[in-house]
Amino acid sequence: MQLHLCFWRFFLVIQFQITIYIYIINIYIIVIIATNAPVLPHQLKRVAKRPALALGRLGAISNPGSGDIFVAFSTGNRGATDEDRFNSIEQFPNNALESVFRATVQATEEAIVNAMVAAETMIGADGLRVHALPRDQVRDLFSH
């Protein structure tokens, strides 16, 4: 799921992309958040907490030992670790992080729904049959 946003605040135009990769394994979910927004490590820690909000919006509850993993990284400051010279880095304004948080939640929610709808009926170990979600019923649920 890729989301392109343009955020306006105090006449400051900030454009960034967020790409969400979802891996659902049994009852566990792994969410990888990739962005080109120039966010620093302490800001990425805050961004990496946001997929839990998307899970909650979809009705999931956290269990002890649920094993959900959320990881975030940014490509916004490429070359910042060049050891041959001094470098300047950009930092996404803290008062504008809400747009990154909102994009992360929305993109995660949509990626989860897309993953659920894309699943197909399958037969697993010991003949256990798991049915795909009926796409038309899922569409109806989200249209209301």
Task: Set out the residue ranges of the language-model regions.
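A structural signal for small-residue-enriched, beta-sheet-centric alpha/beta enzyme cores
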Residues: M1, C6, L12-Q17, I24-H144
